Amino acid sequence: KRCFSYIDDCLSCLIPMLDQKSLNKQIINIGPDEEFVTINKVAEICSNVTGNNLKPIYKKDRPREVKHATCSADKARKLLNYKTKTDLISGITKTFDYIKGRGVRPFDYNISLEIKNELTPDTWMKKEL
């Protein structure tokens, strides 16, 4: 499970942090800690938003993969008035509309990996689709 952030929600905190010296060197989590979803749910939402009948392709787990990743945005709410304004479905819809308007760019699989060994996931090393 994960918490997914829409970029505009993050920027509403990051931009003011540049000007507030009291926030210098502080660690502040930004994210929608009220919406904790599975990757399967994200795939289902993407399928619905795009109008495609997408079926997930399951790969073996990556070594030491984090199963649940979330944060507490309490400090961001307190210091920066952080509020999640864009829920997951709206964020995916906005992102899909942006990509559809701009056009799909090919994915570059030729990025070299800094560390390549037996623990490197297959999906990082070879083209899957």
Model regions: which residues?
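Glycine/proline-rich active-site loop of Rossmann-fold NAD(P)-dependent oxidoreductases
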Residues: 7-11, 16-29, 34-35, 52-54
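Glycine-rich "substrate-gating" loop/helix at the edge of Rossmann-like oxidoreductase active sites
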Residues: 1-8, 32-35, 63, 67
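C-terminal "lid/loop" region of Rossmann-like NAD(P)-dependent oxidoreductases
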Residues: 25-29, 37-43, 51-68, 73, ...
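Solvent-exposed alpha-helix faces
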Residues: 15-16, 44-47, 96-97
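Residues at helix-coil transition
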Residues: 19, 51, 97-101
